Regions:
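N-terminal accessory segments
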Residues: 1-103
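Conserved RecA-like ASCE ATPase "motif II neighborhood" in helicase/translocase motors
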Residues: 176-230
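Conserved nucleotide-state-sensing and coupling region of NTP-binding domains
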Residues: 139-197
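Residue-level preference for the first positions of well-ordered beta-strands
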Residues: 104-106, 135-137, 187, 204, ...
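Alpha-helical scaffold elements adjacent to nucleotide-binding pockets in ATP/GTP-utilizing enzyme cores
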Residues: 148-156, 201, 205, 233, ...
Length: 310
């Protein structure tokens, strides 16, 4: 369940120690009535809710106050917000698809740095809460993992119904396909890479780790299969003006990302790339120095170098 601050009544009690009893404004001093505290707390809660609806990381923190935000999360969240804003603008006729450079995005990150939590769980719920008409595709290297994303987003949406003023559809029992009341079959579709995708075209499709690990990435057959699936299945299921976000750990230069970037050089879809290695190398999109850790609060340089040596 979400962990939210509750409005607690302090009427008839003494001011808690450390709470000012007067508010100063210029040369004027006005008394602070302790009876106003519940109303002030209620106003603060309304502000938090409004910020949560407007910004992805504010939403994530509102629902989970223990969520640890790294600077890379801020960069990613800004990109995700730019992507959904362009999708909405195109849908509403305020932008042409050719005017956006945010509809094809790749995010390269090491394992266990919060990429799936932010991109494949929080982002779809926040996005759908704000735009219930959207259809989302959540995909990964296995159908089981994709369905887990579907299950987790559904449960998070249930916890967020009050915040966004939406409600899960009565038939939202399936983890791989669910929606909101009145959404006319729009919602979440989850599938494994290589699997069939049916239904309405997606406004945003997320591919989260299309290849499981280094061993599978070493197989040319696996790499070719992921690329063919993207070209013949996922890409054909996009709605006009739809976006694709590929978030992955790169295990091989000839992986899905490598092939799509090679296609870009030949005139195919243009991709925006956020490359965030565990340890900074050369020019860094976060402005890190060489060898500086991506998320030092969780994994410092010493531990990352030990892992690299091992």
């Amino acid at each position: 369940m979400p962990r939210r601050n509750k409005v607690v009544s302090h009427v008839g009690t003494k001011a808690p120690e450390g709470l000012p009893t007067q508010l100063s404004e210029g040369d004027k001093t006005q008394p602070l009535d302790i009876k106003d505290v519940p109303n002030m707390l209620g106003q603060l809660e309304c502000i938090r809710q409004e910020l949560s609806r407007r910004h992805l990381l504010d939403y994530t923190l509102y629902m989970d106050e223990g969520y640890k935000i790294g600077r890379h999360h801020r960069l990613i969240a800004a990109q995700l917000e730019a992507t959904i804003n362009d999708v909405v603008a195109i849908h509403e006729g305020r932008m042409k698809e050719s005017e956006s450079d945010n509809l094809r995005v790749m995010i390269f990150m090491p394992p266990r740095h919060g990429k799936s939590r932010l991109v494949s769980q929080e982002f779809p719920v926040w996005g759908m809460g704000n735009h219930p008409w959207m259809t989302w595709m959540l995909t990964s290297y296995s159908a089981d993992l994709a369905q887990e994303f579907g299950r987790m987003t559904r449960n998070k949406m249930r916890d967020s119904e009050e915040l966004f003023g939406v409600k899960l559809a009565e038939d939202a029992a399936r983890a791989d396909r669910w929606g909101l009341e009145g959404s006319h079959d729009n919602g979440i579709v989850a599938a494994g890479v290589g699997g069939a995708i049916t239904g309405k075209g997606a406004h945003i499709a997320i591919i989260d780790d299309p290849i499981k690990n280094y061993e599978e990435a070493s197989s040319e057959t696996v790499r070719r299969s992921a690329y063919n699936w993207y070209q013949t299945t996922l890409r054909t299921r996009l709605a006009p003006g739809g976006a694709v976000i590929v978030v992955m750990t790169r295990w091989h230069q000839d992986d899905l990302a490598g092939r799509l970037l090679a296609d870009m050089e030949k005139g195919a879809d243009k991709w925006k790339v956020l490359s965030l290695p565990a340890l900074a190398e050369g020019t860094d999109q976060l402005g890190r120095s060489d060898g500086e850790a991506l998320w030092p609060e969780m994994y410092d340089e010493v531990s990352l170098n030990r892992t690299r040596i091992a």
